[in-house]
Amino acid sequence: QIFDIYQQILVNMRLMYQKCRLVHADLSEYNLIMYKDGEIYIIDVSQSVEPNHPMALDFLRMDIKNINDYFQKKKKIDVFLEKEIFKFVIEDFDVLVKDFGDSEGPKEVEKDNFSDYKKENQYNAEGLMKLVGNLKLKLDEEDEKQDEIFRNLHLMRDLNSLEEQDFKRFREGKIDVFKTMVVDHRANKQEIA
């Protein structure tokens, strides 16, 4: 049951981001309430920021870390990789189905029926629970290192966020493609150049 609660919180984070267009920015076990029906509610959202806030992606990473730390250290369960959770929260539904769907579920939806499937499931907690369950678990020291690397990455929304040193590294041939440095995120539905 603890693992289900953990997954439900991740689904709520996605719904908050995708539907409400908010990042909590201070999410931890102290901002969660479990109602008697077993439903989890996220509270204390007054400091939440919109996805286009300059620090929104960093806040989201910290929210993910806080939730993972709580469930891993206090509740002693295996948790998902932080980068996988991040992707689960911010990606378009189509990408989620492609990356996290399984052969028995969403991946097998025919192209003709996908728009109907998307309408029914992109904000449906039950459907999202099936997808979140397919994220990769953090099981060893290598996974822990990957989380540490992800936490320390400088995330950028667009090319305007690049610093002069990044352009210098590009000219010197130390960076092949700028797009790999930019979070593939379309909060305003703008394509990344």
Where are these regions (language model features)?
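ATP-dependent phospho-/nucleotidyl transfer catalytic cores
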Residues: 1-23, 35-36, 41, 50-94
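Hydrophobic residue at the +6 position relative to the catalytic HRD Asp in the kinase catalytic loop
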Residues: 27-34
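Regulatory N- and C-terminal appendages and interdomain linkers associated
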Residues: 69-193
